[in-house]
Amino acid sequence: MSDVIALAKDLIRRPSVTPQDEGCQTLMSERLARLGFVIEPMVFEDTTNLWARRGSEGPLFCFAGHTDVVPAGPLEKWHTPPFEPTIQDGVLYGRGAADMKGSLAAMVVAVERFVAEHPDHKGSIAFLITSDEEGPFINGTVRVIDTLEARNEKIRWCIVGEPSSTHVVGDVVKNGRRGSITGDLLVRGVQGHVAYPHLADNPIHKAAPALTELAATVWDEGNAYFPPTSFQIANIQAGTGASNVIPGELQVQFNFRFSTQLTDMDIRERVQALLDKHGLDYELTWTLSGQPFLTDTGALLEATVAAVAAVNGQQPALLTTGGTSDGRFIAPTGAEVIELGPVNATIHKVNECVKAEDLDLLAEMYQGVLERLLA
């Protein structure tokens, strides 16, 4: 069993469902401390974070990731217990195998090997690890970044270990992510009896044309790196449950995944103008989960593409698809940020798994990036 697989299994054994860490960061810290890393736990409320750094000079290279996992779901649907890592036919099963304890293991072992070969490497290496990525993302990476910014500790390059790959490890590198903003809309009407509609005001009927227009709007055309901005209605609630009552209000929740062609303020203003045009009596609150970011050039992207190609024999595709990641908190500081991790086909599913060999290859890729930037 390789060092990478052994560490991955040790991490998976710990049932660290958000926001719990269950000792994962301590396990990582012990190994990093032996390499000369200064270990700095950062605990905010219910969230455990780790900032570990080797070296004091720039440029600063950072591995970022999370030790928390989503709940296992129905245990009877798992082939093997989710927190008892098992290898069958070369495949490692367990909650977090792909998202993202496998990446964490590959990162640590890659750094161990790199430091053994280059004890006096250039710059500094750091780990930014949180137990709050799968949850509300309030006390995790964003709080660590705030702390680093307050003391002017700047990350130059960052690899986030999210499972970026589609079919083969390293076939996709995420060099950016779309922004995400959610709107919670309350449309007011007047409740009444369905047989006396003239005495009521149906908020569903009033809002339907506006919602139809929102769904039909072309918000932008995207660009070379991002698909067009998308609008999706996620939840609609109204009524008492009775078939003879016109509801007094309608609640609608919708989400935008937006490209760099728009700002969140553009979206807010356009939505409000549309709702006003339809004469609705409404309240609208917004939750911005993250701005879009893009690393389209730079030393990190060049080193990552070269390192992946050296292992796989072909260059990765550069994509910005998928959901948000903690990269959205790191990129605004000016850092170059990319995501590279295992195949994501089973993340958040029962029987989450990853080819064991892929984690060894991932460690080679991570080490290859370090070689090209800091050796």
Swiss-Prot record:
Positions with a binding annotation for Zn(2+) 1: 66, 99, 162
Annotated SUPFAM superfamilies: Bacterial exopeptidase dimerisation domain, Zn-dependent exopeptidases
Residues noted as binding Zn(2+) 2 in the record, renumbered to the chain: 99, 134, 348
Keyword entries, A-Z: Amino-acid biosynthesis, Cobalt, Diaminopimelate biosynthesis, Hydrolase, Lysine biosynthesis, Metal-binding, Zinc
Pathway: Amino-acid biosynthesis; L-lysine biosynthesis via DAP pathway; LL-2,6-diaminopimelate from (S)-tetrahydrodipicolinate (succinylase route): step 3/3
Cofactor note: Binds 2 Zn(2+) or Co(2+) ions per subunit.
Disulphide bonds in the chain: none
Superkingdom of the source species: Bacteria
EC number(s) per entry: 3.5.1.18
Cofactor: Zn(2+); Co(2+)
UniProt-recorded Gene Ontology molecular function terms: acetylornithine deacetylase activity; cobalt ion binding; succinyl-diaminopimelate desuccinylase activity; zinc ion binding
PROSITE patterns per record: ARGE_DAPE_CPG2_2
Protein name in UniProt: Succinyl-diaminopimelate desuccinylase
Organism expressing this protein natively: Aeromonas salmonicida (strain A449)
